[in-house]
Design a protein with these regions (language model features):
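Enzyme catalytic cores with a strong preference for nitrogen-chemistry domains
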Residues: 1-172
Length: 172
């Protein structure tokens, strides 16, 4: 992005661009189980998660490295988003962090297993596998558009009613 390059040209040049976006859904077959994958901040991108669910993911695996954000709420924010993704897609989510809290989250958003931040360990946890699509995944991007349209229509109706009342009001 040219705007960032103008702000810090010496730093922008240090960021490698030796990768490109894939063309397949972010779903991998792991011994017959289809797992949707997202790395770090990918979890915030609705289309990526929906594509994984639509691509047949039976669970999601989110990996992240929160080392740069120690002492902040970033890890808890990512866990909250992972929890929301479990509920939204109706799938189990395994959120694994190199230094932050790691959790196994059930499709209903409840925590099944967890490791605290900065605690070395491993979890071996049975997770529920699910197929099918939730209304959130099916409707996806339509919901914000419909809400925005509803807001515009509501404001237009309110504006028309207000102008009609003003026109009918007796003058003093």
């Amino acid at each position: 992005d040219p705007a960032y390059a103008a702000l810090a040209p010496e730093l922008i040049g240090m960021i490698g661009r030796d990768y490109t976006a894939g063309t397949n859904p972010p779903v991998f077959d792991i011994d017959g189980t289809l797992a949707g994958l997202a790395i770090c901040f990918d979890v915030i991108y609705d289309p990526l998660i929906w594509e994984g669910a639509r691509g047949g993911a039976q669970l999601f695996l989110f990996q992240t490295n929160n080392a740069d954000f120690r002492g902040t709420d970033e890890n808890q924010q990512q866990l909250a988003i992972a929890r929301m993704r479990a509920i939204e897609t109706g799938r189990s989510v395994v959120n694994s962090s190199t230094v932050g809290a790691s959790q196994v989250i059930a499709p209903d958003g409840s925590t099944v297993d967890a490791l605290d931040a900065d605690v070395a360990g491993a979890m071996v946890t049975e997770v529920e596998l699910r197929d099918g699509l939730t209304p959130a995944v099916v409707l996806g991007g339509w919901v914000p558009g419909l809400l925005a349209l509803g807001a515009v229509v509501g404001l237009a109706i309110a504006g028309l009613r207000a102008s009609t009342r003003t026109a009918r009001a007796p003058s003093a």
